[in-house]
Every structure is written in structure tokens, then in C-alpha cells.
Design a protein with these regions (language model features):
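Mid/C-terminal beta-alpha module of Rossmann-like enzyme folds, strongest
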Residues: 2, 198-261, 275-314
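N-terminal Rossmann NAD(P)H-binding glycine-rich loop of SDR-like oxidoreductase domains
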Residues: 2-30
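Conserved glycine-rich Rossmann-like NAD(P)H-binding loop of the short-chain dehydrogenase/reductase
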Residues: 30-40
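Conserved Rossmann-fold NAD(P)-dependent oxidoreductase catalytic core, especially the SDR/UDP-sugar
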Residues: 31, 83-141, 145-150
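Alpha-helical membrane-targeting segments
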Residues: 44, 163-188, 229-275
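Flexible, glycine-rich beta-alpha linker
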Residues: 125, 146-163, 218
Length: 314
């Protein structure tokens, strides 16, 4: 697709998913305006863009005036901003509303809002609840917005698969919380391509909600087993009973660097998979990248002898 005349404002473009979304947009020729609270975090994008194709702005999504200024003159607006800890209401609800209202006021042709599987205004989890309320705020301000709900994202820079791999490298035994909870990991580059397609083709995708998952559904335990095998770290896995996991989250979740917060524990009580009948990556004509197809390339760094090491017979 050729989008050389399009201006796309990308909120959160300096983050994990932002990296892949920006790259997908660059390939179309679009001019990308990255709105980032800490602009330096987006510096890595400059070598990836053509001359004059990238602009980086200092914007706090909570600042309505700054958000309005960022979207002025935009053809497309994309909101990738999300947090796992902190003030969910300010970021996922008020911030999302600010972006949607500004996009509508600016006359943007499309708005893509990235939410998450599990978004539900009635969720036990404050994270899931804020994501659901944020979707409602976006729909109210910009009815033709495209909402994307990905499952857990994986990619070279992720904090999910890499976290397990780091634990397997250091710990002699790995505890497993909510081992039966199911996930449908989706490659961040696939999601970035879906975001790009939705932003540049609003006629086909505007006003719709998609749930994005990969080709495999794995339990938490199966994911950890796979990481141990791929990294050659045959660690014993110990299932933590739910009452004990609940106690750990309650007692230590408030501490800095806690392994799991109470809200994350609540999120683990629900499967993180695409709903039956939901439209997904196939609606964008995109294949689903298997976890093993790309992750082994970077997980070899966690093996004792790098890429020359054999896999564990775990």
C-alpha cells in the first residue's frame, strides 16, 4: 500500500508495539508523527525512517491541549498507550478519551485504538475494567474507530517470554502461578501490520472490534515448559496452589518489583484467548506467526553456549 500523502499520529510509538507499528507504517511511505511522553525513548526509530518521514513530539496523553496539538493535521490517529501498573483510569480511560475527542475535532479520517483481550467494564481487574471503559469512551467520541484487542504480545523486546527465559537462566526451580490459564500469544509485528491496515483503510475496518491472537493456544505451564526447552534450561516447574498464589499477590503485590500484583493475579483468573466467532488477523489478510518461528532466534542468547548449544530434552 502507498500512503506517501498520509500523516499518521502515533501515540506510544516509542514503546514495544510502537516499534513494530512504526516500521509497518514507514514501509507504506506514510509520514509518522510519534507522540511520546518521553521523546528520547523513540530515538531508535530515526534510523528506520526515511529522511523527513518521522517527527517525534513530547506529549502526555493526560494533557488534552498537548494531545489536540499533536493530532492537528493528521489523516490517521493511532493510540497504543497502555500500562500494567499505575493509574489505569488516567491512561486507559481519560487518556483514550482525550485522543479520540482530539481525533474527531481534528477531522481525522481514521482512529485505531489498541485495547486488550479481557477488556470489560465489569471486570474484577482494574486493568480489564479500565480497558473496557476506555473502549466505551473511544466509541462515544469517535464511533468509526477501529478497536484492536490483542492477546499477550511476543517479540524480541517483549517482557513476557523474555521474563520467563531470564527466570529459567537464574532460578533452579520455576514456580508456576495459574498454570491452567490459557493464552494465545500474538507476534507484535503481526499486530503492527494490522494497526497499519486499519489506520490506512478505515472504510473496511472502521467501527469494528477485532481480537488478535496467534495460531497456538497454550497454558501458562505449557508456555514455561516451552521456554525451558528452547533455552536449554531444563528446570523443574512447581505449580503454586491458587490459595498460596492469592496470598503472595495480596501480601507482596504492593512492593516495588513484586513478581505479581493483586490486579495481575485477578487477570490471571481468566483465559486470554480470542472469543469464539471474533474477527482477527485473517480479516486483514495477515497470516499468524507461530511463537517458535521467530522467538528461537533471540532465545538462543539465554542458552549456556548461545546458538551453539543444543536444546534441553526437557
Amino acid at each position: 500500500m502507498d500512503a506517501r500523502d498520509r500523516v499518521v499520529t502515533l501515540f506510544g510509538g516509542g514503546g514495544f508495539l510502537g516499534r513494530y507499528t512504526a516500521q509497518a507504517l514507514f514501509r507504506t511511505g506514510a509520514r509518522v508523527r510519534v507522540a511520546q511522553r518521553h521523546p528520547r525513548r523513540a530515538n531508535f526509530l530515526h534510523p528506520l525512517a526515511a529522511v523527513g518521514q518521522l517527527q517525534v513530539l513530547a506529549v502526555d496523553i493526560r494533557d488534552r491541549g498537548a494531545v489536540r496539538a499533536a493530532v492537528r493535521g493528521s489523516d490517521c490517529v493511532v493510540n497504543l498507550v497502555g500500562i500494567l501498573k499505575g493509574d489505569f483510569e488516567a491512561i486507559h480511560v481519560a487518556g483514550a478519551r482525550n485522543v479520540a475527542e482530539a481525533a474527531a475535532e481534528a477531522g481525522a479520517g481514521s482512529l485505531v485504538h489498541v485495547s486488550a483481550i479481557g477488556a470489560d467494564p465489569d471486570s474484577e481487574s482494574a486493568y480489564g475494567r479500565s480497558k473496557g471503559e476506555g473502549e466505551a469512551a473511544v466509541r462515544a467520541a469517535f464511533p468509526d474507530a477501529t478497536i484492536l484487542r490483542p492477546s499477550i504480545l511476543f517479540g524480541r523486546e517483549d517482557n513476557f517470554i523474555n521474563r520467563f527465559a531470564g527466570m529459567a537462566r537464574l532460578a533452579p526451580v520455576l514456580p508456576v502461578l495459574s498454570g491452567a490459564t490459557r493464552f494465545q500469544p500474538v507476534y507484535a509485528a503481526d499486530v503492527g501490520r494490522a494497526v497499519t491496515a486499519a489506520a490506512l483503510h478505515p472504510r473496511g475496518h472502521g467501527g469494528r472490534t477485532y481480537e488478535l491472537g496467534g495460531p497456538q493456544v497454550l497454558t501458562m505451564r505449557e508456555l514455561m515448559e516451552w521456554v525451558c526447552e528452547t533455552t536449554g534450561r531444563g528446570r523443574p516447574l512447581v505449580d503454586i496452589p491458587d490459595p498460596v498464589g492469592r496470598l503472595i499477590a495480596r501480601a507482596t503485590g504492593w512492593l516495588p518489583g513484586a513478581p505479581i500484583t493483586w490486579d495481575q493475579w485477578l487477570m490471571l483468573r481468566r483465559d486470554n484467548v480470542v472469543s469464539p466467532g471474533a474477527e482477527g488477523l485473517e480479516a486483514f489478510g495477515l497470516p499468524k506467526t507461530p511463537l517458535a518461528a521467530v522467538s528461537e532466534g533471540w532465545l538462543t542468547s539465554y542458552r549456556r553456549h548461545g546458538r551453539f548449544a543444543a536444546k534441553s530434552p526437557y
